[in-house]
């Protein structure tokens, strides 16, 4: 953010809003915890979900690039430095190569049948430690304790949220609340268009207040039966839900990413208020909503890649395979 403001010439509210919005795309780009949670609830393949998130995630990134280009043109913002040479780009690629290799190992290993998603998590940890300690030499043995403590805190917090959401989902199912809500939704939505429109609205609102994993546990069991009954691809449905929740994280007035972004200190005497970032984030939300509509009503944008890579009969999104 400071670099965009001081060197790039962008306004502080715009820069802060851009960082908040772009960071929310992380739950759409594999490997995504939200996809793992969705797959565990619905029984879809984690590999299918990971592959399905690639194109929508890239589309969201392209949409934000367009917003930045329009902002730069509107305020006549010129490049703050010369274009990198071929050698500089190659050097940067070589420095980042080992980091780029991790998602390739995870996704390639899962989709190639070399290891399961759980094993992929273990492999990625070992690989990350190897790269950090041996290749980049930024991690030492002395850092291990702090790393493990931070990991335990993060994992513990996530699992506490997931446990609470799972308990809520269990209570709803036990007392018939989930079935009643599902029947109500089915009675209102008689076709895919209406159903998807209602679901989008629900998830956009839910994403403002609840983190993606909790929202999955609460709403997916209610919506999935209707989704299946209407014949909508459940892998595409999972991607659509995740994109919704990503947008919800930056939707005013309670988008959690907005509060994180405005807490970042840009420089002394320059702070961004919630009102300022709420105005600045509007075009970015509009761009992401445009992508959401494409993903929702043209599901092939998220399904063609997993279908193309899946072995015959192994794709888990089609209703015939559920």
What feature does the model see in each segment?
Residues 1-322:
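Alpha-helical transmembrane segments of multi-pass membrane transport proteins
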């Amino acid at each position: 953010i400071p670099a965009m403001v001081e060197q790039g010439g962008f306004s502080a509210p715009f820069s802060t809003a851009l960082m908040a919005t772009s960071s929310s795309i992380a739950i759409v780009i594999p490997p995504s915890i939200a996809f793992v949670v969705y797959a565990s609830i619905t029984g879809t393949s984690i590999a299918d979900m990971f592959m399905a998130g690639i194109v929508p995630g890239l589309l969201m990134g392209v949409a934000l690039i367009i917003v930045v280009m329009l902002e730069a043109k509107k305020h006549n913002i010129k490049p703050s430095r010369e274009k990198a040479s071929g050698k500089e780009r190659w050097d940067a690629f070589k420095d980042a190569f080992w980091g780029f290799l991790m998602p390739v190992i995870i996704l390639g290993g899962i989709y190639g049948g070399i290891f399961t998603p759980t094993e992929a998590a273990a492999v990625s940890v070992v690989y990350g430690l190897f790269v950090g300690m041996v290749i980049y030499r930024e991690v030492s043995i002395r850092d291990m304790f702090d790393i493990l403590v931070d990991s335990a805190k993060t994992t513990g917090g996530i699992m506490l949220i997931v446990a609470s959401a799972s308990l809520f989902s269990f209570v709803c199912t036990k007392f018939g609340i989930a079935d009643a809500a599902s029947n109500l939704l089915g009675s209102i939505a008689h076709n895919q268009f209406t159903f998807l429109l209602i679901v989008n609205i629900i998830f956009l609102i839910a994403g403002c207040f609840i983190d993606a994993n909790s929202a999955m546990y609460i709403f997916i069991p209610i919506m999935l039966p209707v989704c299946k009954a209407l014949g909508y691809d459940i892998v595409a449905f999972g991607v659509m839900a995740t994109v919704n929740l990503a947008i919800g994280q930056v939707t005013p007035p309670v988008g959690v990413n907005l509060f994180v972004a405005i807490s970042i200190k840009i420089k002394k005497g320059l702070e961004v208020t919630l009102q300022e970032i709420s105005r600045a984030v509007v075009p970015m939300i509009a761009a992401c909503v445009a992508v959401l509509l494409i993903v929702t009503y043209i599901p092939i944008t998220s399904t063609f890649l997993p279908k193309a890579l899946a072995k015959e009969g192994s794709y888990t999104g089609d209703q015939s395979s559920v």
